[in-house]
């Protein structure tokens, strides 16, 4: 099967559900019929969100692993890339995914509050793993939406839920220049947004960065030109005019 499927799994905690997103990657064709490139010469791909799934609160991790394994063992999803939230309690769960030996290329991703992307190897497995600032994930989604390269199939049962999460998602920059992210409504969640963002980030990052053997750090745009005064901005207008809904 073509290696064009990327799955993102956001692992929830006691008050947050876990969520799974499946994206299909396809090249953007230029006027000459070749794969289009951006201003830096990087190849351009678009991503169609084919599947969204939210697990009920309280779903045990072995049940989530079983469901994901069921999906990746289906003929159309074998050899998919699977990026898993390894933040906090997610670390031992990632090890359980590796132990399952499901037919997927598993990549752990730890969400951080810093300003650099770090790449290293995961424990004894030797698999590539990333530590990624949350603003980097958000910026990736913003860029893809603004260039109309991220779309969702509107018939998906959770398509409207994802849209609400996108509309509610806000960025707050504090006086100390630290970003905080999340829903602007009490009791709302951002699990679907993060599942999509992790999958999209991994796909975009692997296009631009080859496999490397040693730990490496990549500066992010978030580390530059930070405001010195508190700023709160909703990013909802960008979602509305982006052409996100096919």
Which residues does each predicted region cover?
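A contiguous, basic/glycine-rich beta-loop/short-helix subdomain that forms a polymer-engagement track
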Residues: 1-18, 29, 38
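Short, solvent-exposed helix-loop connector elements
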Residues: 174-187
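Acidic, metal-ligating active-site segments
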Residues: 14-28, 195-198
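Structured core elements
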Residues: 6-10, 19-22, 83, 194
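Structural motif
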Residues: 131-132, 184-192
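Short, hydrophobic/amphipathic alpha-helical patches that form generic packing surfaces
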Residues: 139, 143, 194-204
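Mg2+-dependent endonuclease catalytic cores in nucleic-acid-processing enzymes, primarily RNase H-like
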Residues: 29-175, 225-246
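Acidic two-metal-ion nuclease catalytic site recognized across multiple nuclease folds
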Residues: 190, 200-246
